């Protein structure tokens, strides 16, 4: 079994590196003739190798310097899951009718692939096309979260007492008495490491509460000492009791006190922190769709990492991103990745098709047909 997993990881790595280096012949070699892609915007399409080359070469024509590092890659059986950030400048050709803006793009994907005979046979791309459009400058971006006075003071305390070397970060933010430093910046010379440091302020000083580092070459493959079945059971309970059952008491039993959420799967993004932050994040969705449920989900797990592709359904009863309720049922999909620490969820990278939700609430918005 391990030989198959290593063969599959080699094929998947070649597949991604082929995108990074415009090596379309390698794509043709590692993609199965009947390759099927499930994409949040384009639906399901049997592309085969040539179709996949077309999808990726179109994207590279629009963002010539775009690339995917691979911070996390796990495998189980004939399935494999990757955390796949996207970086690049929109300086090339128009992309799906959007003229190039020169903007720097940073957004995340969580992808699950199925391999057959050492070739990529099926792929589920998890990404938020709205985030892609916002990064391209084709849709308005929400304003960044404003720090309160205590949070600003704690960031300043971090800069004065912890970051004495004056290091740069992808993101430096605070939630109450907690400071979160994510880095290094992706333009740094050695961007193969992704580090999350969480500090807690007590009595005027900052103490390190937790620290986690991924290398992107080779990618993190899950902690071999962690029990895969325990990790899977914790995530299953999150889906069954919290996402389906709307039970926030259960969340307190299965989430770390320092749980961190990256809502568009971007490693440098830190939008929700702690059990209260996660509860607030979930309640935003439940206010818009009070009967929101997960209709179906599938997991891939290795060590302390679990990836899940899922389909959600709910009735529009409240505002969603300024769009009024319609009373209609909305359906959407996503792929998420979870890191487990001490039997609790410590980190979530989430992708969901926000643009698809918006286009169902207001068809004039249009779903678009992106295939990256």
Give the label of every model feature segment:
Residues 1-372:
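C-terminal and inter-domain tail/linker signature
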